[in-house]
Amino acid sequence: MIINIGLSGATGKMGRTILERIDNFKNCKISAKFNSTRDLHELNDLCKNSDVVIDFSTPEILEKLVDSALKYDTKLVIGTTGFTSSQFKLLEKAAKTLPILYSANMSIGANLLGYLAKEATKILDDYDIEILEAHHRAKKDAPSGTAIMLAEMVTAEKELDITFNRGNKTRRTNEIGISSLRGGNVHGTHEIFFLGDDETITLKHEALNKNSFADGAIRAAIWLQDKQTGLYSMLDFYKNLINYHLKKPI
C-alpha cells in the first residue's frame, strides 16, 4: 500500500529536500503540495488528498492546517518551529483526535544528542549546563527550536530555568542558558556543555546538509500510519532503535 504524503512548505529549503529524497522510499509518494504563497483554503485540498501531511512552513498557517486535518482525518508531521504557547496548545488539543508528531529536529543525530544529554544530566548533577547553537544567517527564530527542545529534554531530568539572555547578570545555579550564533550557510550545529570545576564535557551534533532532517520526516510520516491519537515526538520514533542498540553487549 502506497502512503500519500502531502507536503506543506514545498518550495522552502526543507520542502525541496524532501522532494529530492522521497524516491528513496518505495512505500510512499508526494500526493499534494502547498506553499505559503497560495490561498490557505487550498490546505483543504492538501489534506483531502493525503494520508499524512509533512509541514515545514510558517507558524501563521497552523490553525488552518489543523482545521483541514481534522476535517479530513489527516495525520500530521510538524517540523515548523517558532510556535507560540497558544499554538502548542492547539496542537495538543488536535492530538486528542489525530495522531500528530511534532519535533523541532527530525534527524536521528539531534535526537540521540538529546537522549545522551538526558543521561549525562542524571550523572553530572553538580555541573553547570549550557547550550550553544549556530545556524545560517537567514534563519528567523533564535534560539533555534532544536536548542529549546534539547534544553527541555535536560530540564525534564533536572529542575532548571531556561534563559536566553542574561545581559549583565551573573549565572544562577538553577538555570540552563542558550546562546545563538547566526552567519554563513550553517545547516545547524548544537553543542551541550557540562561545565564542572575541574573538567568540561561537550556533546555536539552538526548537520552537514538537510538530508537527515528530510529522511527523518519521511520516516516519521510512515511510522505514524498505525499510531493511535496522541502527540508524539521524534524520540518516540527513535527510542526503539536506541533501546535496541543499548541492549547490545559492549
From Swiss-Prot:
NAD(+) binds at G9, A10, T11, G12, K13, M14, G79, T80, T81, S103, A104, N105, M106. One of its GO terms (cellular component) is cytosol. Pathway: Amino-acid biosynthesis; L-lysine biosynthesis via DAP pathway; (S)-tetrahydrodipicolinate from L-aspartate: step 4/4. Coiled coil: none annotated. PROSITE patterns: DAPB (PS01298). Its EC number is 1.17.1.8. It is found in: Cytoplasm. This is 4-hydroxy-tetrahydrodipicolinate reductase. PANTHER family: 4-HYDROXY-TETRAHYDRODIPICOLINATE REDUCTASE, DIHYDRODIPICOLINATE REDUCTASE. Pfam families: DapB_C, DapB_N. The active site is at H135, K139. It comes from the Bacteria. GO terms for biological process: diaminopimelate biosynthetic process; lysine biosynthetic process via diaminopimelate. Catalyzes the conversion of 4-hydroxy-tetrahydrodipicolinate (HTPA) to tetrahydrodipicolinate. SUPFAM superfamilies: Glyceraldehyde-3-phosphate dehydrogenase-like, C-terminal domain (SSF55347), NAD(P)-binding Rossmann-fold domains (SSF51735). Its main location: cytoplasm. (S)-2,3,4,5-tetrahydrodipicolinate binds at H136, G145, T146. One of its GO terms (molecular function) is 4-hydroxy-tetrahydrodipicolinate reductase. Keywords: Amino-acid biosynthesis, Cytoplasm, Diaminopimelate biosynthesis, Lysine biosynthesis, NAD, NADP, Oxidoreductase. Gene3D superfamilies: Dihydrodipicolinate Reductase, domain 2, NAD(P)-binding Rossmann-like Domain. Belongs to the DapB family. It catalyses: (S)-2,3,4,5-tetrahydrodipicolinate + NAD(+) + H2O = (2S,4S)-4-hydroxy-2,3,4,5-tetrahydrodipicolinate + NADH + H(+); (S)-2,3,4,5-tetrahydrodipicolinate + NADP(+) + H2O = (2S,4S)-4-hydroxy-2,3,4,5-tetrahydrodipicolinate + NADPH + H(+). InterPro entries: DapB_C (IPR022663), DapB_N (IPR000846), DapB_N_CS (IPR022664), DHDPR_bac (IPR023940), NAD(P)-bd_dom_sf (IPR036291). HAMAP family: DapB.
